């Protein structure tokens, strides 16, 4: 009886606090149940969920800045002995977003093992045109340098393709591998193509010795007049061919990566124009955790180029990488850049990248 009276005598504020406490308990119970369910599902399907992030400080244009890099959510799952899934979602800065950040679906890949090392892949992939794009995802902790080479920033190669293809690896003594992919072309959206043309990617590689890979690739696409490519409207129909070659060696002491892409863009108005984008990276492990490195980039465009933004550029990067462990890396580097449009630029960047 006394308990009932005390409840009646509670103030409105006290009632609200009591309800909020109970609501909090209910929410915590629901979250706990969801986590237990998710853990059970992950165990059944052998699912792995990982994250990657980097923070950096940069001295550029006579000022010091601090910034956040991309936050990468990386999910892999083995559904059974033949089907597997890979998903990669990135949260990154976007000046047009109300929150200054946006979500980008970078990869959704469903893989079916046909037989042995032959696989059928469907979804959104990293276009396998060179070693860097085929090997590294958006987790900066694995990059040998702070950022990608300039040919990526200049959008020389299409980073992603949505479609279907075949993939195989590690055949014979040379450990031969191949990729053949047909997908939506440049300018297509995430749910449909913008024209009737399809892009074709064909790539082969060998691994003659441990830690070495030599590759060659070819890409062909027709970009329709009026296509929106990264915010740029293409005013001509462009027939594009890209041929890339790469050499990669990451040994116990020496690291070497050299890649080059030769682009041919042809229109009925301007004819055929050539572009050559290349870079060379080298590193040497002086101790177990310290790797000094360099990278030289070069972008060379033919006069009259109308698809790529013509900006002949040379850049030199020198830096030091300290590997705290497999999932924590500190990098410090200096970059000198001389470009046709922006002149000379010098900057120093420090980065701390982790995986978790």
Task: Specify the residue positions occupied by each region the protein language model found.
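Bacterial N-terminal signal peptides that target proteins for export
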Residues: 19-28
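N-terminal signal peptide c-region/cleavage motif recognized by signal peptidases
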Residues: 37-38
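Surface loops at the rim/top face of extracytoplasmic beta-rich domains
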Residues: 187-202, 225
């Amino acid at each position: 009886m006394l308990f009932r009276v005390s409840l009646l005598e509670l103030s409105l504020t006290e009632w609200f606090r009591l309800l909020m406490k109970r609501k909090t308990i209910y929410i915590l119970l629901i979250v706990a149940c969801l986590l237990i369910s998710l853990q059970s599902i992950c165990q059944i399907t052998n699912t792995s969920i990982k994250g990657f992030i980097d923070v950096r400080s940069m001295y550029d244009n006579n000022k010091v800045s601090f910034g956040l890099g991309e936050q990468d959510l990386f999910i892999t799952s083995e559904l059974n002995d033949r089907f597997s899934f890979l998903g990669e979602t990135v949260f990154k800065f976007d000046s047009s977003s109300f929150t200054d950040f946006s979500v980008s679906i970078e990869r959704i890949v469903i893989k079916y093992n046909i037989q042995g090392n032959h696989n059928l892949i469907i979804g959104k992939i990293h276009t396998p045109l060179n070693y860097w794009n085929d090997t590294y995802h958006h987790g900066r902790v694995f990059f040998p340098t702070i950022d990608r080479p300039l040919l990526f920033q200049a959008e020389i190669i299409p980073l992603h393709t949505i479609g279907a293809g075949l993939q195989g690896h590690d055949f014979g003594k040379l450990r031969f591998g191949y990729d053949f992919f047909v997908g939506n072309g440049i300018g297509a959206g995430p749910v449909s193509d913008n024209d009737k043309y399809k892009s074709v990617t064909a790539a082969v590689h060998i691994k003659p010795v441990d830690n070495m890979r030599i590759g060659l690739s070819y890409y062909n696409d027709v970009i329709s007049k009026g296509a929106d490519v990264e915010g740029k409207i293409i005013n001509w129909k462009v027939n594009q061919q890209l041929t890339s070659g790469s050499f990669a060696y990451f040994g116990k002491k020496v690291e070497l990566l050299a890649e080059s892409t030769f682009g041919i863009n042809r229109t009925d108005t301007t004819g055929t124009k050539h572009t050559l984008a290349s870079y060379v990276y080298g590193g040497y492990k002086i101790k177990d955790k310290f790797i000094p490195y360099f990278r030289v980039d070069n972008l060379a465009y033919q006069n009259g180029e109308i698809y790529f933004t013509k900006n002949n550029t040379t850049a030199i990067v020198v830096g030091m990488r300290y590997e705290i462990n497999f999932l924590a890396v500190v990098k410090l580097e200096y970059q000198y850049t001389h470009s046709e449009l922006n002149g000379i630029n010098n900057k120093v960047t420090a980065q701390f990248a982790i995986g978790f």
